[in-house]
């Protein structure tokens, strides 16, 4: 059982839902990024999604796209992101999921990625643009599968495909609440209720976390009864973007984390 499984077990015992917080590694620069993440851990984030900056993040909206641009300009890459995780592990025991597009992993090398991710202290990986049927070439290089493989389910995913995705997932399943890119509008709770019910009937107990369109405490409060957790990213990156030259940027992100966690 890795840290992700342990976290969900702890939350279930406390009748709590998970706050999964996304930030881009190295935004606005590596030093302040570390400070922001440490503050998020202290402020109540249950699982950290650490975005690996990429030059063409097609699933992300403009806010997270700009965060990738800032991080890349500051020199962040996959190897340095692993160094960041390793450094975080000295003070932060929160489960960490490396959130990446496939291209950086392909360039890095699948076996090396797996080894370095585990060595750094990462607990899982979410590859946003790699569907299960195309992932065998990569995952066969991961002999022990000690790294949780988070899978995405979209509103357009047919029920039989949900079952296939769930069979290949571990850690949790990320349910995308709406079509489009990150940072869009609010989720339709009626449709989301149907989606979560359909997915839960097919995922054999794997936790389900809902993301896209959740930026305020009231969004998190409304969605939390339907899932095991919520994923928030754009809201944090908006704060980082607005206060990137402010020494209080980490504390402002921490305040947002605290408010969202309190709503769950």
Curated annotation (Swiss-Prot):
CDD domains given in the database record: Tryptophan_synthase_alpha (cd04724)
Cellular component per GO, a single term: cytosol
Catalytic activity, as annotated: (1S,2R)-1-C-(indol-3-yl)glycerol 3-phosphate + L-serine = D-glyceraldehyde 3-phosphate + L-tryptophan + H2O
Protein family membership: Belongs to the TrpA family.
Subunit organization: Tetramer of two alpha and two beta chains.
Role of this protein: The alpha subunit is responsible for the aldol cleavage of indoleglycerol phosphate to indole and glyceraldehyde 3-phosphate.
E.C. designation(s): 4.2.1.20
GO function terms (MF aspect): tryptophan synthase activity
HAMAP family noted in UniProt: Trp_synth_alpha
Name of the featured protein: Tryptophan synthase alpha chain
Biological or metabolic pathway of the protein: Amino-acid biosynthesis; L-tryptophan biosynthesis; L-tryptophan from chorismate: step 5/5
SUPFAM superfamilies: Ribulose-phoshate binding barrel
Active site: 49 (proton acceptor), 60 (proton acceptor)
Keywords: Amino-acid biosynthesis, Aromatic amino acid biosynthesis, Lyase, Tryptophan biosynthesis
């Amino acid at each position: 059982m890795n840290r992700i499984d342990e976290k969900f077990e702890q939350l279930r015992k406390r009748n709590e839902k998970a706050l999964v917080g996304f930030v881009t590694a190295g935004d606005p620069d590596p030093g302040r990024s570390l400070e922001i993440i440490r503050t998020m851990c202290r402020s109540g984030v249950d699982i950290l999604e650490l975005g690996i900056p990429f030059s063409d993040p097609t699933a992300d909206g403009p806010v997270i796209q700009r965060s990738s641009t800032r991080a890349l300009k500051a020199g962040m890459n996959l190897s340095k992101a692993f160094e960041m995780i390793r450094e975080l592990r000295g003070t932060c025991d929160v489960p960490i999921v490396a959130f990446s597009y496939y291209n950086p992993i392909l360039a890095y090398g699948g076996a090396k990625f797996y080894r370095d991710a585990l060595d750094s202290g990462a607990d899982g990986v979410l590859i946003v643009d790699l569907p299960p049927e195309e992932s065998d070439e990569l995952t066969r290089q991961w002999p022990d599968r000690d790294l949780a493989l988070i899978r995405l389910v979209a509103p357009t995913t047919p029920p039989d495909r949900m079952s296939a995705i769930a069979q290949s997932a571990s850690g949790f399943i990320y349910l995308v609440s709406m079509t489009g890119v990150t940072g869009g509008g609010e989720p339709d709770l009626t449709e989301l209720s149907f989606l979560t019910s359909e997915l839960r009937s097919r995922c054999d107990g794997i936790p389900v976390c809902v993301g896209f369109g959740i930026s305020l405490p009231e969004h998190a409060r409304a969605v939390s009864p339907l899932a095991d957790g919520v994923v928030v990213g754009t809201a944090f990156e908006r704060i980082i973007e607005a206060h990137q030259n402010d020494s209080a940027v980490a504390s402002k992100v921490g305040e947002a984390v605290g408010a969202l966690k309190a709503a769950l």
